[in-house]
């Protein structure tokens, strides 16, 4: 895919994909797995999230992980997708700020879960992490929105970039033999 300068680039797509994957792995999977590990060591009352407590107590750990993956997919994929589809203006950097907020929250949640499981002093209280997370969403999406207004980024089609990457991998594989 060629841009206006004649340079083939999908780095915007790769950056956003990496941020999405990082947020999914930390806020979605990492938090769920470390929560279960912490509950194994401290008991169900160690979990600060009442919804997670209810899910694990009544439906088991596998249902909790399935629910967390489902909810994470909706929050990280469908909400930004709807924002991009409905927006007249570019929202690339705004969505990157959104993903970065979830990544930071996921890392902090994992750290707190591991500290609680090991009976260590907590870096932050869960309420502080939630406040920080909500603040980051507000700040980073606002900054991203302003950057989008000033730079007007031209983002390539995700599917075209994906096909281009597949073609590069296949070319590399066939040229090796």
Describe the residue ranges of each PLM region:
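Hydrophobic alpha-helical segments at protein termini of multi-pass membrane proteins
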Residues: 2-177
């Amino acid at each position: 895919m060629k841009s206006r300068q004649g340079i083939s680039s999908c780095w915007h797509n790769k950056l956003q994909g990496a941020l999405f994957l990082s947020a999914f792995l930390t806020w979605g999977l990492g938090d769920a797995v470390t929560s279960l590990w912490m509950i194994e060591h401290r008991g169900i009352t160690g979990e600060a999230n009442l919804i997670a407590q209810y899910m694990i107590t009544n439906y088991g750990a596998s249902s909790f992980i399935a629910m967390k993956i489902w909810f994470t997919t909706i929050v990280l994929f469908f909400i930004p997708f709807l924002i991009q589809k409905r927006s007249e203006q570019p929202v690339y950097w705004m969505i990157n700020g959104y993903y970065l907020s979830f990544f930071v929250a996921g890392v902090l949640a994992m750290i707190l879960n591991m500290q609680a499981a090991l009976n260590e002093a907590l870096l932050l209280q869960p309420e502080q992490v939630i406040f920080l997370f909500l603040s980051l969403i507000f700040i980073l999406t606002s900054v991203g929105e302003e950057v989008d207004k000033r730079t007007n980024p031209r983002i390539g089609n995700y599917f075209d970039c994906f096909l281009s990457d597949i073609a590069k991998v296949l070319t590399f594989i066939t040229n090796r033999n």
